[in-house]
Amino acid sequence: MENIYTSAAQLIGHTPLLELTHLEKKYDLKARLLAKLEYFNPAGSVKDRVALAMIEDAEQKGLLTPQSVLIEPTSGNTGIGLASVAAARGYRIIIVMPDSMSVERRQLMKAYGAELVLTPGAQGMKGAIAKADELAREIPHSFIPGQFVNQANPQAHYATTAPEIWQDTDGQVDAFVAGVGTGGTITGVGRYLREKNPAVRIVAVEPKTSAVLSTGVPGKHGIQGIGAGFVPAVLDTKIYDEVIPVADEDAFATGREIGQSEGVLVGISSGAALWAAIELAKRPENAGKTIVVLLPDTGDRYLSTPLFAD
């Protein structure tokens, strides 16, 4: 029987879990450490799930027409995912992004046909959101999916990411670790896993120098994709048991380490999440437990960043 897909959107999801056996051995971890490799999505990141969910939700609600112009403020991966889905569906798309994001991200969005508007990096995501709102007022037929406020974001993870984790581990998952950007991943996955097993520990990861969830104080940091500098509307702040702040240098070092030890090339926020997961796995109370860490994207869009600096 043929197993042939007719659209790139059909390739989104069903990403694999990889046990990080080399890191388990290196750090003498007594817990089992499983990485969900989201770079297996067609446009290379977990945000493919969110992009597809937001566009399909808008289409079902009659909010999009062939004349629609999608405008989205994004630090990168959602823009790449939206550009991919928009290209396949024939929509014009404008991405508004802080100029502090990697040059590879810009090139990838342009490769999918997106138009780019850059905002000052010092303004963070707040600056990009304000500019997107301004453009939406000026451009006819514009629609902002709005990943920071759109409930289709966490719902995508509740409906796809979390069930995949549950099924692939046969329900044997004791802790879930994820970085917080919009908060969609940890909210959606956390809710589903909690419904299945209230004892599952949900751990959020944020940049140490912009520890908004821990301290309420935003700041500059180098971990692209997490640490938006505010508490996003879609984030359920009651869903996580613990927040682990991660230093930029630890995120970079761990991101490099998984490539060189496991043969898996991932991005900066993956390094941050993995550093936190390793710290969790070192704790004596987690001996014999299974920890799942979500690694959001591929490292090849960070080759120009300090992640892979010589």
Model-derived segments and spans:
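PLP-dependent amino-acid enzyme catalytic core
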Residues: 1-310
